[in-house]
Amino acid sequence: MQHWLRLLIVAWLAIGSTLCTAREDRAVNWVFVADLPREAQQTLELIKDSGPFPYARDGIVFGNYEKRLPLRQRGYYHEYTVKTPGRRDRGARRIITGQGYEYYYTDDHYHTFRRIRE
């Protein structure tokens, strides 16, 4: 009986780790910096230079409520506005930063993300 229990535990752990890995890989679509819109490239440079940022909400915590990025503790991600030509408001484009120095770009207000490759 203990043998079956051990097998069950091993199988459960294997399935769980596979599911966690799949969840981590959700945002695997990549985009090169050179392929980003010019405004996104400029925002990325501002982020790396620690500002100054043009929008008051730049740098706020991004909650990842839709769980489209890898799951991390609250406060791990921060968001920055990418200017949209012709828009008076903040528009839909953002760069999300992670504490692990990863950067994600969305041009549809958090529906899809591409990880920025430098």
Language model: regions and residue ranges:
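General helical secondary-structure elements
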Residues: 2, 19-22, 89
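Residue-identity detector for glutamine
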Residues: 2, 41-42, 73, 99
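Functional cores of ribonucleases/endoribonucleases
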Residues: 51-118
